[in-house]
Swiss-Prot record:
Keywords: Acetylation. The modification N6-succinyllysine is found at residue 15. The modification N6-acetyllysine is found at residue 15. The gene is HDHD3. It comes from Homo sapiens (Human). The lineage of its organism: Eukaryota, Metazoa, Chordata, Craniata, Vertebrata. InterPro entries: HAD-like_hydrolase_domain, HAD-like_sf, HAD-SF_hydro_IA, HAD-SF_hydro_IA_REG-2-like, HAD-SF_hydro_IA_REG-2-like_cap, HAD_sf. This is Haloacid dehalogenase-like hydrolase domain-containing protein 3.
Length: 251
């Protein structure tokens, strides 16, 4: 007779799964620039940030830790390059803006808890599930979660900066399992990124659920993920867990 699967550990992505920026990034950057006497279009800053972040992540992955950078310096460089790409060539004028933005994005008021997130976390705890965070965030995450009243829900918060490996590297998931003293078969991960949050945990034998944001899911991703693993909202998580636990392990 087959044993019933029981999930005991739920690990969570944070950005765009539990939290999001209170204001669009381009607007936040433009507002801070305006306070320092610079007028820059939010759309140009948004586009510049995407390019700068992608290039920095490629050249210095995981905050450049293996290159001797700190996450703070990594982010300051991203902001400087963002403004450069948006047409601001005066790095000296941007430097204090970058410093202030780093502080602002460390503050809980810059972020907002997504609808249903706190209720879902509370219901998971009521069920007896252990909860933890696995995030590609930096060292500021603990303070942000604490300021928003979410830290108390988690046994531990594991960032890629602390672990030394970013998702989807299998080692960050293995480290979380080690910290929790759990086997992968009784653990599941929840997040919004297909590679980092869906495929990554499955590579080490965990289960996973993909949270769908306001944008339509890429057709290739949609076709490769069973519909019972897709969460249109966090309110769908507990029913999806019930469905998973009603299945036969290994099938």
């Amino acid at each position: 007779m087959a044993h019933r699967l029981q999930i005991r550990l739920l690990t969570w992505d944070v950005k765009d799964t539990l939290l999001r920026l209170r204001h669009p990034l381009g607007e936040a950057y433009a507002t801070k620039a305006r306070a320092h006497g610079l007028e820059v279009e939010p759309s140009a800053l948004e586009q510049g940030f995407r390019q700068a972040y992608r290039a920095q992540s490629h050249s210095f992955p995981n905050y450049g830790l293996s290159h001797g950078l700190t996450s703070r310096q990594w982010w300051l460089d991203v902001v400087l390059q963002t403004f450069h790409l948006a047409g601001v060539q005066d790095a000296q004028a941007v430097a204090p803006i970058a410093e202030q933005l780093y502080k602002d994005f460390s503050h809980p008021c810059t972020w907002q808890v997504l609808d249903g997130a706190e209720d879902t976390l509370r219901e998971c705890r009521t069920r007896g599930l252990r909860l933890a965070v696995i995030s590609n965030f930096d060292r500021r995450l603990e303070g942000i979660l604490g300021g928003l009243g979410l830290r108390e829900h988690f046994d531990f918060v594991l960032t890629s900066e602390a672990a030394g490996w970013p998702k989807p590297d299998p080692r960050i998931f293995q480290e979380a399992l080690r910290l929790a003293h759990m086997e992968p078969v009784v653990a599941a991960h929840v997040g919004d990124n297909y590679l980092c949050d869906y495929q990554g945990p499955r590579a080490v034998g965990m289960h996973s659920f993909l949270v769908v944001g306001p944008q339509a899911l890429d057709p290739v991703v949609r076709d490769s993920v069973p519909k019972e693993h897709i969460l249109p909202s966090l309110a769908h998580l507990l029913p999806a867990l019930d469905c998973l636990e009603g299945s036969t392990p290994g099938l």
